UniProtKB/Swiss-Prot annotation:
Monomer. May interact with SFRS7 and SFRS9/SRP30C. The lineage of its organism: Eukaryota, Metazoa, Chordata, Craniata, Vertebrata. Possesses RNA 5'-triphosphatase and diphosphatase activities, but displays a poor protein-tyrosine phosphatase activity. In addition, has phosphatase activity with ATP, ADP and O-methylfluorescein phosphate (in vitro). Binds to RNA. May participate in nuclear mRNA metabolism. This is RNA/RNP complex-1-interacting phosphatase. PROSITE patterns: TYR_PHOSPHATASE_1, TYR_PHOSPHATASE_2, TYR_PHOSPHATASE_DUAL. The keyword RNA-binding applies.
Length: 331
């Protein structure tokens, strides 16, 4: 059986990625159910680095869509650039690989896949992976203002839950404030009552790996994530690995070096940490409306400095990741 191994020695043969191997393969290019009902991209959540969006679809899906319905990885970057924002990381929570490939993102762009089962509250391991990824990104990008883009299929339920879970557990935000902020900025409200109930009434999740001591939590937790980059060499020159040989796990990509940084840090999670500055959040939508109504949405107004229609993203103009990346594949 083929597995990943971290070059620095923190990946072993007993380390197995969780989640995807039990997923059923879904072939074809059928549009995800209700995908058209949702806005492609929300707005940045004020006081945070988060922006949520629905899953972009690769070009082969476009034959099933009207031109105005298309939303590709390239469209994603254009829409975020139109908000005068810059994306620095994508966290993909979908439980499949069929919607788009990391190779369709700009060269060397940081991309992290966390297979997250839909409809049910994410387990503690998934929550911990997400927190680790966000913390690592913030630590390495404290001198810039790049955003963390998070998506599931619709960019609402799994996405909203994990973003809110982070804001509640790490930033000390009140659950209703976190839910309200996400809903207003996404343009759609959290729909699943089990997610809402857990955010409001569920326990605060630990910010370290429950299977190890706190002082070694970050060091031993890197196996729980799957950081990958788009390939830096042409796609047709990459070695091919059969999905059955890899038991459904993603093909090897480049490791993000923030895993090394994670191994040496133990962060104090504080309610008054300055990533989120508490402020009044106006109700999301028209007065008197119940914003927990299923799939209720309202118009998202563009940012004041929104760029013009001629301001378009081109892969060659995007920034390069200022650190090395590497991987090793063993059998």
């Amino acid at each position: 059986m083929s597995q990943w191994h971290h070059v620095g020695g923190h990946w072993g043969q007993d380390r197995v990625f969780s989640g995807y191997s039990s997923a059923k393969k879904k072939g074809g290019n059928h549009i995800p159910e209700r995908w058209k009902d949702y806005l492609p991209v929300g707005q940045r959540m004020p006081g945070t680095r988060f922006i949520a969006f629905k899953v972009p679809l690769k070009k082969s899906f476009e034959k099933h869509l009207a031109p105005e319905e298309c939303f590709s990885p390239l469209d994603l970057f254009n829409k975020i650039q139109e908000q005068n924002e810059e994306l620095g990381l994508i966290i993909d929570l979908t439980y499949t690989r069929r919607y788009y490939k990391p190779e369709e993102l700009p060269e060397n762009f940081p991309y992290l896949k966390i297979y997250t089962v839909g409809h049910q509250v994410p387990d503690d391991d998934t929550i911990f992976k997400f927190k680790n990824a966000v913390n690592g990104f913030l630590r390495e990008n404290k001198d810039n203002d790049r955003l963390i883009g998070v998506h599931c299929t619709h960019g609402v339920n799994r996405t909203g839950y994990l973003i809110c879970r982070y804001l509640i557990d790490v930033e000390g935000m009140r659950p209703d404030d976190a839910i309200e902020l996400f809903s207003r900025c996404r343009g759609h409200c959290l729909e699943r009552q089990n997610y809402i109930d857990d955010l409001r009434n569920g326990p605060i999740r630990k910010n370290w790996d429950s299977s190890v001591s706190r002082t070694r939590g970050f060091e031993d937790s890197t196996h729980m994530m799957e950081p990958v980059f788009t390939a830096t060499k042409p796609v047709n020159r990459r070695p091919k690995h059969n999905i059955h040989q890899t038991q459904g796990y993603p093909e090897p990509r480049h490791f993000h070096t923030w895993t090394q940084d994670l191994q040496q840090s133990e962060r104090k999670f504080s309610q008054n940490w300055n990533i989120y500055q508490r402020c009044h959040v106006p109700p999301p939508g028209p007065p008197g409306e119940d914003y927990f109504q299923r799939r209720y949405s309202w118009n998202v107004k563009p940012s004041a400095g929104q760029g013009g229609p001629n301001k378009r993203f081109s892969p060659g103009s995007y920034y390069r990741v200022p650190y090395s990346a590497y991987y090793r594949w063993t059998k």
